């Protein structure tokens, strides 16, 4: 094993903030800057650990995306796309509205992930963190769910093709990772695992537990849909019941982890009822899985998370902290960070690493929800183990 001069690489550049549909859009990459500055102000991230993203090439994008789609994104970048084309490629609504240089800014997000893949595979670092990425809804030929290019799927395919790696994608975002799933639905070199709020009530409406892959890919797609208002104990129980059997059986060479933090009860777009407790625990458990099964090789992405002031910075900080084996934080946030950003925030900034829970609503049906979730999780774990025999 090669020696790692710095075990963990953290992708950041102000260029990543340019991925912005419009000023009122809920997907706001300012959350990445808030997180990075929080880590720096708390002396938890060293400038030497920061790496710059490159721009992914067209050939790299087309590991997953169709040629005509990539060309359409280029045209949209310069405002020269017809209404019919925009509709065909999912660029005709507020969700995925066109913006200047969208191809370059989207390809930079992909390039950040590929930069980490090369660093890890060359032995220069052990693991990496790309919180500006995690665009799991983008389809091979269509934009979807705030996502233009699917950096996770491209990275998985890149690792499989260039380095002959078996790749496991673990997605804990509140929304089902549909674009990633469909990219590998008939593939047995990449396994996708997604635990999410049921699609009965939430975009994109997919991710049913019966979606299990097809042909040689059967059994390489695992979905764990949870009931609305699921709380910490149930989420973590179902996650641990179902994810480790997948890792143990598939035997990946590397893990790609999607850390959407929209399972938090303060997130405005979802209906789960988790706290920072879950969001702190999840990446540490994924890190344990990587240490136990992939010799520590893991790339952790961002994902959803739309309360950018009170939730995302603290939660995403712990994604990075899990990689560098730092403990979960407690106590006061750096005053320097609070004093800078309180003038920009639309709400009162948190003062501590912990949730105050002063506005947390306990759900009367907690027991019923938890029992239903556990029953499904046990069924999924049993099914999965039966497919591997």
From Swiss-Prot:
Function as written in the Swiss-Prot or TrEMBL entry: Role in growth on acetoin or butanediol. Involved in the breakdown of these compounds used as a carbon source.
Keyword Chaperone listed: no
Family: Belongs to the histone deacetylase family.
Name of the protein in its database record: Acetoin utilization protein AcuC
Molecular-function annotations in GO: histone deacetylase activity
Organism, scientific name: Staphylococcus aureus (strain MSSA476)
GO BP field: acetoin catabolic process; epigenetic regulation of gene expression
Record-linked Pfam families: Hist_deacetyl
Keyword Metal-binding attached: no
CDD domains, per the entry: HDAC_AcuC_like
Domain of life, source organism: Bacteria
Pathway named in the protein's UniProt entry: Ketone degradation; acetoin degradation
Membrane-crossing segments per the record: none
Keywords, sorted A to Z: Acetoin catabolism
